[in-house]
């Protein structure tokens, strides 16, 4: 990109920013960087401009860069949720491509700033991840690259299993606190005479405390706090990895909403620009490529856009029933901003994917049968419920620690809350040894396989399967 093109881009950024503000978008200060493909794909693989080194990121970079070199896919931009918000543009983009991208990332930044799921996000995560990378590099120098990399392998295999509720009471309990004395009334009426000085002697009963007292979703935190295997440097790395995952988690919970919101606004903003005929044609092609539906999956840009457009249409022209509920005509845009603020993908789909929209967009459920894919259901509620199910827990299996002292031997017992989708057995058998590495004792995972309850265990020697 030459100097003249950079000046043109700067003018376009200023104009697009003013248009976005005029529409009511509220975003952090923006910082734009123009980067070559090598840099963009490095950021894409690592997830951030500054992050610790790991072989899995290199593998992802090679795959993405190869697809780019072969013309199979292309990343036009990357946007970082921070304050200020950073957007990285590919240096080979045309001016109209960059105009679309600037409008798109402004809407992303508005979403980051205003959606309730992002309210506890650390806005200085770029600097925080840079500090994490330095600390991990230090541990590699002290303990060896292989030792640290092996530990990172274990953490990254279960990194999604955190509790995204950042504000919650801290539970105080310990594996050493196995028994407590419970006072029982000598008679059913003792509590009625509790003020009497001559109370009957209490009976004392010893009872084993559950550990944890209730199922614990945050497996990383549980291991961090209670594993007897971890050294201080390992516990430190585990803490940092959990913090990074907490940063990424809201993006997993709002993927469809976020992309739909950005797609809606880049269309509206670009329409306000004075485009040449060539630019208008190129924009139409680019936009069609971004929001086109897929026959074999869900395009989050497309689905999110269609739901937001449907909200605007229905609330601009409310039915008599909606009017009785207090909905005012021409309130579509206001409702969209409200939805953007308070919903996640699950509630967004459950509350706003209507029967009419499912039928109009011809959404359906399909299944692979032999070599072919067959449509198995077109009922709108089935489609909606399946989409909601796919977004539960960010799309990852819901696991909880149910016992940290299983068999009274400090073994770890994890339960998979089965809801119709079985665990990937190949992945499960690879993850169990990593859990053993982190916990230091035998690890068990309860799940359902072929409609039968089954427990998978790893004792340091091999994976065993037992039907319950």
UniProtKB/Swiss-Prot annotation:
The keyword DNA repair does not apply. Coiled coil: none annotated. Pfam families: SpoVR, SpoVR_C. The keyword Oxidoreductase does not apply. GO terms for biological process: sporulation resulting in formation of a cellular spore. InterPro entries: Spore_V_R, SpoVR-like_C, SpoVR_N. It comes from the Bacteria. Keywords: Sporulation. Appears to be involved in spore cortex formation. To E.coli YcgB. PANTHER family: STAGE V SPORULATION PROTEIN R. This is Stage V sporulation protein R. It comes from Bacillus subtilis (strain 168). The lineage of its organism: Bacteria, Bacillati, Bacillota, Bacilli, Bacillales. The gene is spoVR.
